[in-house]
Amino acid sequence: MYVPAHFREEDLVNIHTLVRTNPFGMLLTNSEKVPEVTHLPMMLDAGESKDSILGHLALANPHTQKIIDGTDALAVFSGIHAYISPRWYVDTNQVPTWNYQVVHAQGTLNRIEDPRLLIRLLDELSHEHESGSKKPW
């Protein structure tokens, strides 16, 4: 993704905040013809040396069947965005643009096959996304 240097965000606190406040993202992997894409809620697990993105795909999802350990992937999280009119500038020699916040997280996927670990992951995901509710599930 092209990001002009003056818009590039390097502060991990800001990057983590965008991911945590916009957890519904896209998981993309390569396939033979076109990229595979699944929209799903995910969760950031910020580690001391590296970060992980946790998520769950249903077994019935065809994308799931194409994922093996070590599959390269891209997770995309979108924040706020807005059209920018050239009328808003003092200098009228401008063109329209679009400002946006987005995080592209690249990494490799690991399947969780152990039922106990899978249940723990689902519990963590549910807890993360239920935590803002008055009566969590």
Positions of PLM-derived features:
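Binding-site signature for planar aromatic cofactors or substrates
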Residues: M1-W137
